[in-house]
Amino acid sequence: MSAKLSESDLNDFIGAQVACVKPTRTLHTADEGDEALEVGKEPQEATKVSISLQDCLACAGCITSSEEILLSRQSHGVFLEAWRSLAPKALAVSVAPQSRLSLAQHFGLSVAELDQCLSGVLGSYFGAKYVVGTQLGRELSVQQTNARLVERKQQGVQGPLLCSVCPGFVLYAEKTKPGLVPYMLDVKSPQQITGALLHAADPNIYHLSLMPCFDKKLEAAREDCAREVDCVLTPREFVALLDELQLDLHSFAGAAVPIAQLTPPGWDPRVSWCSSAGSSSGGYAYQYILHMQRLHPGSTIATQAGRNADLLEHRLLAPSGVLLASAGELYGFRNIQNLVRKLLSPATKRSAKVVRRRLPQASPAPPATDPCNADFIEVMACPSGCINGGGLLNGGLGPSQRRDLVSQLNEGYARLPTLDIPMPTYSQPSYIYNLRPLAPTDDVLTVANAW
């Protein structure tokens, strides 16, 4: 006998805040009149729902009930409870560069001043054993990405590979576009690799990660990411944490702990807190082209803008003009929709004829800019990428103000100290996800992710 539920019992049905874009699917059945909801029984039509999180999951649309439970275990309140009973574990904190920039802008500090205040509040007040940036994790992520791409190119495999460090995009592909999964590179993100490195330095730690995106919480909760990150907070939540504890971040500048004291043995603090050339979403596309340029002396890099601000293509050209390698940056759901169509839907003959009619006398020219045709695509769910993450301190701004803020943060990102990512000189453990299509569920308590 099935249990009867009302709408108020289903935690996917809540008051209007952020409406989902569309129902997952529509089921056409005979009208059975007004009935109580039953477990396992879908209504006539999948209704639009709202998510109960204060902020949406970095453009990933609706979330399932089970995911909301996971997110509830990653709040600043949960962190405080864990921190107060941490002994005998030690606290380790990793901070993404986008989070540092957002916090610095919010508090009216330079990034260097913000880093001092963070070392003070995390090292002095919270007693953190380690406080690190995520660049070392990014370095390993980029190196392993490049190695896989070069191996694939040497084997003559055609078609693009997609970066999988954005959990919003990964969730979307695994849940709603399983055909994308074979295109996805399974190298882990800097967040997870940094966590693995910290646990290698001291297995008895509690790892808090400050990330620009709410979806990073779900990434940390993946089965293939177990024990790498214990809790993820966004800059918004970190500010809420400070407010709850009535802490003035500025006051901790005088209590700053030297970064070297908060760095694990064997780590170079300069690497940990620096950045590298490329986009403010990790620079994966540009770093691949730089890597290929080292393998082809005399080659040059040409960067071309796409049809909108969230499309960019980097090309490596031989002295003769021959294309040696290409990589694209593709951000935002509209561009991801186009990517899905190009990868999963064959082009029609009619569209090709239309192009020929429009350009009957076209002279030979280089291929048109299209990141979707590149060897490798740096895909991010958020428009403008990680520098516009849903967890950053950018709420309440209109579109124009938000664009201005993104521009300011990108300028700040470009001013971060940079180091070249070297060619790997030693054997590394592989840091990989177990990417797989996730079967849809008919459970009435679950609403699958849909943008």
Swiss-Prot record:
InterPro entries in alphabetical order: Cytosolic_Fe-S_CAF, Fe_hydrogenase, Fe_hydrogenase_lsu_C
Superkingdom to which the source organism belongs: Eukaryota
Provide GO CC annotations from the record: cytosolic [4Fe-4S] assembly targeting complex; membrane
**According to the UniProt record, which cysteines are disulfide-bonded?**
none
Q: Which UniProt keywords apply?
A: 4Fe-4S, Iron, Iron-sulfur, Metal-binding
Pfam families referenced in this protein's UniProt entry, alphabetically: Fe_hyd_lg_C
Q: What does this protein do?
A: Component of the cytosolic Fe/S protein assembly machinery. Required for maturation of extramitochondrial Fe/S proteins. May play a role in the transfer of pre-assembled Fe/S clusters to target apoproteins.
What is the official name of this protein in its record? Cytosolic Fe-S cluster assembly factor NAR1
Q: Which organism is it from?
A: Eremothecium gossypii (strain ATCC 10895 / CBS 109.51 / FGSC 9923 / NRRL Y-1056)
